[in-house]
């Protein structure tokens, strides 16, 4: 499958702002089941992009906006060829052993409520892979997915469970927190999801055809496997993996000291029409 992606982020600054340091994570990597055919990154500011890798091996670009300016616009655009690997990840850049991804963060803390939720999966299944699938099903049935901006600060694991509804990022936080409690390494993934029907002008499901978050968990004998509890399935050829970290903060597509953020995202089968999904958030 070939997926055409366009991701535009515009961030507002205080009028006359100068010397703003910016980091963007908007460049995916190739791995088994995902091949980057072409990819470009454009800015509305005349500055020099410095390419580098972060601690997790994500491709990043850093730059400084000298100013004065009141906004910054970043456009990532390209085409990716994907294949279905039944969610099993091979050929990804691995900077750390799986055990590092047992570490909790503020967004993935295993509170008593999260622990009780995770223990339900332990009671129904004995083997790690079965527990991960049971966890995905239970989460899908417990927390309703609601569309939310990728830059809007997903809920913590505890907040998502307590509210009973969350965007894909909050759901991924709950899955990773619960899996880590069970002793199964889990990590946060950002990326894109194309609709299954190439003729769909508009996505029929929330979060389809736009930026999305999901989780990967490590199962002995299998390795890393992607789990999208919001949709109750493992990754397919409709997913494009962008960045990996311990939680949503680590995969943020843009980090700076700006104010309001707006983004427009499309991720569609190259055979079908293109439709932009819009989001807006306040930092």
PLM segments and residue spans:
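Linear, non-domain "peripheral" regions
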Residues: 1-119, 125
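Conserved structured core elements
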Residues: 3, 168-169
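N-terminal start-of-chain detector that recognizes signal peptides
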Residues: 11-15, 44-51, 158, 185-189, ...
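Short capping/connector residues at structural and topological boundaries
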Residues: 18, 70, 106-107, 165-166, ...
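Glycine-rich, small/acidic residue-mixed loop/short-helix segments
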Residues: 24-34, 39-41, 231-252, 256-261, ...
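Secondary-structure boundary elements
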Residues: 80-84, 89, 96-166, 174-176, ...
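Hydrophobic/aromatic-rich core segments of domains that either
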Residues: 170-260
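Intrinsically disordered, low-complexity linkers and terminal tails enriched in Pro/Gly
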Residues: 194-200, 276-283
């Amino acid at each position: 499958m070939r997926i055409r992606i366009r991701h535009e982020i515009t961030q507002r600054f205080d009028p006359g702002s100068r010397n703003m340091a910016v980091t963007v994570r908007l460049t995916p990597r190739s791995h088994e089941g995902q091949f980057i055919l072409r990819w470009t990154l454009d800015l509305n500011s005349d500055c020099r992009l410095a390419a580098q890798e972060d601690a997790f091996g994500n491709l990043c670009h850093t730059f400084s906006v000298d100013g004065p300016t009141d906004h910054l616009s970043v456009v990532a655009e390209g085409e990716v060829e994907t294949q279905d690997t039944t969610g099993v990840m091979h050929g990804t850049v691995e900077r750390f052993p799986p055990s590092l991804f047992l570490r909790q963060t503020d967004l993935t803390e295993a509170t008593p409520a999260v622990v009780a939720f995770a223990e339900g999966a332990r009671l129904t299944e004995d083997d790690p892979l079965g527990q991960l699938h049971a966890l995905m099903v239970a989460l899908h049935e417990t927390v309703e997915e609601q569309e939310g901006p990728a830059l809007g600060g997903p809920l913590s694991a505890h907040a998502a469970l307590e509210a009973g509804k969350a965007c894909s990022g909050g759901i991924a936080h709950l899955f990773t927190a619960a899996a880590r409690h069970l002793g199964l390494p889990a990590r946060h993934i950002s990326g894109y999801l194309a609709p299954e029907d190439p003729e769909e002008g508009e996505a029929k499901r929330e979060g389809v055809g736009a930026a999305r978050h999901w989780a990967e968990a490590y199962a002995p004998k299998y390795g890393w496997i992607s789990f999208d509890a919001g949709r109750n399935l493992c990754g397919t050829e409709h997913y494009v993996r962008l960045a990996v970290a311990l939680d949503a903060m680590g995969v943020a597509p843009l980090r700076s000291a700006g104010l309001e953020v707006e983004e427009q995202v499309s991720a569609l089968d190259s055979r079908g029409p293109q439709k932009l999904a819009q989001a807006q958030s306040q930092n």
